[in-house]
């Protein structure tokens, strides 16, 4: 069931997830399409998330945006960043000298090499913000050696998270704390509980499909005049993902864009995505167990010990997962 409408305000709207957005030329969504998108959201009872470019907007757009409840996703280098509900850093260097708000949510989009090299710096952000989401921009390039490095990064973040917990704080770091708190899958769910309206006035499963180098006609799933027309819509639902629906890496993005890119099947996750999610899961388990040595901590939560990182490794015993 759809819950959110993501509206890209400009062709150069920031990425906030795994996909890369290389469009530099600004082309605003038509004002009529913006208003029609808002009417669509009202009719379907959807919450709107506006995704901003790095430039200012005309006053009439600002006024239209405020006609409905919404949240704003804005890049850190935008002149409107103080209005953001979610601030996006597209480079870790953009955090240097940035004035963090302890009550705000931040997304750090980062490649693996920068993450490995800057883990100590990034770890200091955990105590400065209400929530930090770390999003890898090159998941498909991870090797076995990279997985080992990522585990080391997670261990470092896990120690910092424990430190904050023990100081009486409530840190939120997506790759560590989400799995500790979750009791069921909490994925991206593009195509099932959210859909994207692009600047061309058409709908796409998520922004990644709009920004794909492939023909946009391939990925368009409707428009403002005709409504949504998602082919095989059930395939975007968790219930139709045979491996993911029995997995307990509940914090996994289950990114259908990466699935399609890596396995040519939106229901089948890649080895890289699975291993990264299970490394995060296991670190969450370690933090949970460590905290329980000192006090009661999420007593209702039970993250079982496992001996695999990719469910395909135990495919014969899927019923044991």
Predicted features, each with a name:
Residues 50-52, 134, 197:
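Conserved beta-strand positions
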Residues 210-321:
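Flexible mid-to-C-terminal extensions adjoining Fe-S/redox cofactors in radical SAM and related proteins
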């Amino acid at each position: 069931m759809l819950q959110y409408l993501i509206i890209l305000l400009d062709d150069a709207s920031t990425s906030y997830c795994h996909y890369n957005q290389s469009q530099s030329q600004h082309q605003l969504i038509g004002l009529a399409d913006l208003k029609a998108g808002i009417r669509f959201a009202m009719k379907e009872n959807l919450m709107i998330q506006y995704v901003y470019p790095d430039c200012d907007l005309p006053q009439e757009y600002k006024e239209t945006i405020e006609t409905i409840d919404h949240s704003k996703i804005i890049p850190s280098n935008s002149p409107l960043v103080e209005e953001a509900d979610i601030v996006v850093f597209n480079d870790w260097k953009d955090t240097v000298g940035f004035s963090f708000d302890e009550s705000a949510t931040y997304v750090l989009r980062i490649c693996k090499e920068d993450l490995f090299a800057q883990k100590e710096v990034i770890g200091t952000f955990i105590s400065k913000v209400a929530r930090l989401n770390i999003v890898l921009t090159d998941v498909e390039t991870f090797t076995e050696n990279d997985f080992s490095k990522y585990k080391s990064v997670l261990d470092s973040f896990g120690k910092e998270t424990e430190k904050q917990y023990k100081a009486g704080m409530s840190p939120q770091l997506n790759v560590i704390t989400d799995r500790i708190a979750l009791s069921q899958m909490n994925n991206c769910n593009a195509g099932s509980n959210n859909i994207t309206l692009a600047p061309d006035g058409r709908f796409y499963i998520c922004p990644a499909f709009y920004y794909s180098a492939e023909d946009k006609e391939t990925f368009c799933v409707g428009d403002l005049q005709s409504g949504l027309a998602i082919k095989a819509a059930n395939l975007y639902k968790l219930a139709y993902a045979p491996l993911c629906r029995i997995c307990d890496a509940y914090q996994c993005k289950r990114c259908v864009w990466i699935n399609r890119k890596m396995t040519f099947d939106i229901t089948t996750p890649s080895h890289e995505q699975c291993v990264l999610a299970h490394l995060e899961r296991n670190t969450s388990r370690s933090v949970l167990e460590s905290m329980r040595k000192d006090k009661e901590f999420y007593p209702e939560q039970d993250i079982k010990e496992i001996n695999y990182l990719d469910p395909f490794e135990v495919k014969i015993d899927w019923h044991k997962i």
